[in-house]
Amino acid sequence: THLAQPEAALVNNVAAAHLEGFGSIEGVARAKGEIYRGLTPNGVAIINSEHNYIEFWQKEIGSHSIQYFNAGDYKAENVKHSSNGSTFTLVSPKGSIEINLPYLGEHNVKNALAATALAMNVGASLADVKAGLEHRSQVKGRLFPIQVNENLLLLDDTYNANVDSLQAAIDVLKGYDAFRILLVGDMKELGEDSLKCHQQVGEHAKQAKLDLVLSYGIESAVISEAVLGKHFTDKAELTAYALDIIKQKLQENQKVVVLAKGSRSMKMEETIYSLKDSLC
């Protein structure tokens, strides 16, 4: 905002990421809130009602008007999820419209609300928003679906990972009526909170009652341990183990969904590519 003053500014979420640099989630919130400092005189500060750190941001926001998404000004009603994405009624200050979103998961509905709030505050109509949300191709590394065959779906969510995004991805995997496998790598840059954060994800995976959890790296061992899964320090060994399980389930005519996710440095996409090449 030193280079160009925005007419609308938004903090989409505040999560346990980059804690090594910012020290705490409050530090992350303070740093993200600096974006509001450069608003134009009539600019609008947009806040996620589920990640509301207004006490840290009030100084930066000053007298600017505030709008909220997820609850308040922009929200989703009648939400229905499927293997192809989500449908919902988008409610805004300028009316409502039905949306068919081609992205998986509840978290992407919330991302759509964030995008809507920004777009409408700089002049977009509801029709513009609908066109923008519905006519976007899925992005590799972001819950990208790879349908290998009728009974096998790979979900490539390997671009990066933090606690919130990994839990959101687990929630997507949980919703499938299939044998559900999670391949999870370490989450990096969590500093002193690393163990706690990985344990939190392990508990979330346990609550999701996934069928198999395989972890790779160092810190992620506690995730697989929480669900009586299996940990690996060699990615090729993890992939080979997963491949054997998948082949067994397919021979039993079971549907299988595999989700891979981890921090960027873990390169968990290599597991997806290997499985795809071996099973196509």
Model regions: which residues?
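Short SAM/SAH-binding signature in class I
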Residues: 8, 114, 250-262
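Residue-level marker for buried hydrophobic side chains located in beta-strands
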Residues: 45, 154, 182-183, 258
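Glycine/threonine-rich flexible loop motifs
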Residues: 19-26, 166, 191-195, 269-270
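Active-site beta-alpha connecting loops in nucleotide-dependent enzymes
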Residues: 139, 162-228, 235, 263, ...
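Short amphipathic alpha-helix with an adjacent loop that forms part of the alpha/beta core around
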Residues: 2, 239-252
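Acidic, Mg2+-coordinating active-site environments of NTP-dependent enzymes
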Residues: 2-153, 178, 203-206, 211-212, ...
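ATP-dependent carboxylate/acyl-activation modules
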Residues: 140-142, 265, 269-273, 280
